[in-house]
Design a protein with these regions (language model features):
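Glycan-processing catalytic domains of CAZymes
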Residues: 1-229
């Protein structure tokens, strides 16, 4: 299936919703899909901005907004193409710990789902920055305690940190070249996690990675992945 990023910044503020709306309305392509709520403020270099600059702020106005948000995605949940787990529509949350009341949000949406003829919702927390096994287990347990059914492990932004040899080479030979992005060879173990064997964990497979179109010289680029790796 295909997971579409879904933007809801609070008070009904949305962006980039047209492509998915057309998929929903046209019933094409006839291909399984799910939604992932990219609930974060657009700011800093990760979003192609100077540090400290904010383009769009993510807000959480409260229950009325949560209900409006649910009603907006309900037609997608009821679409026959929508990906389900245990007969529940799967919904990803990009920043699961940034909601001021994550557990309440999940409980509210579960009740709304049942009231609207769904069996429930299968909530998946997207987690990263898992530099150690202890950190990975801490984040996993935190997500589960908030009510998430599953966890998606994404270490894409942490991957270069693990390559000590490459960091040393860059520091010694390229310390004055601040005008080039962070270019490093791909290694499969960059994305391994001690959580990957759990039944409620969705590992991430990433065929290369290039964030430079958005972040330019401050971006990260991984190259050289193959099906074998």
């Amino acid at each position: 299936g295909f997971v579409y990023w879904h933007y809801w910044f609070g008070n009904g503020k949305r962006l980039l919703e047209r492509p998915f709306n057309e998929v929903l309305a046209s019933e094409q392509p006839n291909f399984p899909f799910a939604l992932a709520w990219a609930n974060e403020t657009w700011s800093g270099s990760f979003h192609g901005l100077k540090e400290g600059n904010v383009l769009i702020e993510q807000t959480y106005p409260g229950d009325d907004d949560y209900i409006a948000h649910f009603n907006t995605v309900l037609p997608a949940f009821k679409d026959h193409r929508y990906i389900t787990c245990e007969e529940k529509p799967v919904f990803f949350v990009y920043r699961p710990f940034e909601l001021p009341d994550t557990k309440h949000f999940i409980e509210l949406w579960r009740s709304l789902a049942i009231k609207n003829g769904l069996s429930d919702i299968y909530f998946v927390a997207i987690i990263g920055s898992l530099h150690t096994d202890d950190r990975a287990n801490e984040m996993y347990n935190r997500a589960k305690n908030l009510g998430f059914d599953g966890v998606n492990v994404v270490n894409a932004y942490d991957a270069p940190i693990t390559d000590l040899k490459y960091r040393l080479i860059r520091k010694v030979f390229f310390k004055n070249l601040k005008c080039i992005p962070d270019i490093r060879p791909y290694r499969a173990d960059m994305f391994d996690s001690c959580l990957d064997g759990r039944m409620d964990v969705i590992p991430t497979v990433m065929p290369n990675w290039d964030h430079t179109p958005r972040t330019g010289k401050r971006g990260i680029l991984l190259y050289g992945s193959t099906p074998v790796k």
